[in-house]
Amino acid sequence: MNRNKREKEYYSIDVGDSTFTVLKRYQNLRPIGSGAQGIVCSAYDHVLDRNVAIKKLSRPFQNQTHAKRAYRELVLMKCVNHKNIIGLLNVFTPQKTLEEFQDVYLVMELMDANLCQVIQMELDHERLSYLLYQMLCGIKHLHAAGIIHRDLKPSNIVVKSDCTLKILDFGLARTAATGLLMTPYVVTRYYRAPEVILGMGYQANVDVWSIGCIMAEMVRGSVLFPGTDHIDQWNKVIEQLGTPSQEFMMKLNQSVRTYVENRPRYAGYSFEKLFPDVLFPADSDHNKLKASQARDLLSKMLVIDASKRISVDEALQHPYINVWYDPSEVEAPPPAITDKQLDEREHSVEEWKELIYKEVLEWEERTKNGVIRGQPASLAQVQQ
């Protein structure tokens, strides 16, 4: 595309402390959130005739970690197609050459609120169990592609007023190091599983713990384990659930085990004490959902030893959840992620930049040709 024509397609607008340079089809930009990975605006898309969310990745090429994360997010968003994971509608950059390339914009479906806002609401059993069912469906879909999230939290889950739910991100890369004795940095750890906090090996049900913490917060209206760092996080967990068995301790590496074994021992509380009936909504006549079922599910999800914690599939079959069971949602075809080494490869910032630029150009080519993999036919007509 020639430079002048391309420049005419874009305009710049200040949004908060940032400048967005976007295609003219996107109007009425309003800031709706910001995080470590970027600033998000709502906008009206005149081509699709709908409201959308536009995320500007924040300084994606400032270092290898940022560049690698940007590449991973873009590649995964392009591949994943499930109703409980946010859908990618467009990708663009206003820059014209690889040398100039510095900004990446992702256009996504716009939702009404994140789960932090929903937690403050009085939810009945139907809504609570339906939201949990959708979280489990979305996570199962990621697991089918070999993506284990490890960092699910309310701020990264969005909902619409009709109670539909979508997961916004893909969590920690496989190579992201975590651990009890590591230098703390600013990040929400309240929902991270013990095996992540303690730097152990993990399996897919690491995400079941996070969903259990989110469910507990929806029931209680407050965070279950509000740790200030990994060590405090572990203390909060054992104060409530009790010190785990010696069998569990033997799975820890020596330095972590020494620390953990020297903590005071806690008996913990029963789930009846942690989640008394008074915290739950009234029993549901319609789907026969009860506080006792919800509490039973919590007691199976919030198990410190992952080998004794239920799996995503078992959670989906639990009486509190399986009233919504639909094979087309639970067993949706897995995403075709060809790059199995997505997290393992190491590149320089310049190499990551070139890989990301190629992905953006490939998207532009596909949209020009009316082919957007994994998107409904109506969206395949999008022109730049």
From Swiss-Prot:
Gene Ontology biological-process annotations: determination of dorsal identity; JNK cascade; positive regulation of NLRP3 inflammasome complex assembly; rhythmic process
Cell location: Cytoplasm; Nucleus; Synapse
Claim: Cytoplasm is one of the keywords in the record: yes
Modified sites of kind Phosphothreonine: T183
PROSITE patterns: MAPK (PS01351), PROTEIN_KINASE_DOM (PS50011), PROTEIN_KINASE_ST (PS00108)
Catalytic activity, reaction form: L-seryl-[protein] + ATP = O-phospho-L-seryl-[protein] + ADP + H(+); L-threonyl-[protein] + ATP = O-phospho-L-threonyl-[protein] + ADP + H(+)
Post-translational modification: Dually phosphorylated on Thr-183 and Tyr-185, which activates the enzyme.
EC assignment: 2.7.11.24
Listed cofactors: Mg(2+)
Domain Protein kinase: 26-321
InterPro entries: Kinase-like_dom_sf, MAP_kinase, MAP_kinase_CS, MAPK_JNK, Prot_kinase_dom, Ser/Thr_kinase_AS
Sequence positions bearing Phosphotyrosine: Y185
Annotated family: Belongs to the protein kinase superfamily. CMGC Ser/Thr protein kinase family. MAP kinase subfamily.
Domain-level remarks: The TXY motif contains the threonine and tyrosine residues whose phosphorylation activates the MAP kinases.
Function: Responds to activation by environmental stress and pro-inflammatory cytokines by phosphorylating a number of transcription factors, primarily components of AP-1 such as c-Jun and ATF2 and thus regulates AP-1 transcriptional activity. May play a role in the regulation of the circadian clock.
Record-given protein name: Mitogen-activated protein kinase 8
Organism (species): Danio rerio (Zebrafish)
Gene: mapk8
